[in-house]
Amino acid sequence: MSITESIVNINGTLLKGDEAKISVFDRGFLLGDSVYEVTRTYESIPFLLKEHLDRLWRSAEQISLPISYSPEQIKVEIDKCIKELAIPNIYLRIIITRGSGEIGLDPDLSPTNNLVIIAKEQLEYPKWWYEQGVSFVVANTLRNPKNSLDPNTVSYT
């Protein structure tokens, strides 16, 4: 599925993927001031949606990003994407940005969030991966220091 076949929901407005636009003054674009969560559907049902939204809220709390949508409102917008795309297995990326405003480091310069939901066909791994298996390598990278941002925070910052 190409970008033109994807659906993007921006603050409740459904758009084709190649028509979706967000302001270059959005802090998510300018500063990475956003959080995101990724899940998928199985037979049009979002997988562990409550848990993913809980983690989205925890990530937002880690960067002091108040979310102006309720989990129920986000679920409604996800359902709109699922209905519009009308396929059973969908990749869902849920993004909350701090929003657009004056350029500056003060987060209060952006009073309203932007909610972006990207919905596209979930690409499946090749069948042989499941039948034959695949090889992976585990890196010897050390963990982040304890005083750094929680590595479970899902953000672009």
Q: What does each model-identified segment do?
A:
Residues 1-80, 102, 106-156:
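Helix-start/capping segments and mature chain N-termini
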Residues 82-86:
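Phosphate/pyrophosphate-binding loops at sites that engage ATP/ADP/AMP, CoA/4′-phosphopantetheine
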Residues 87-95:
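Ordered, amphipathic secondary-structure segments that act as subunit-interaction surfaces
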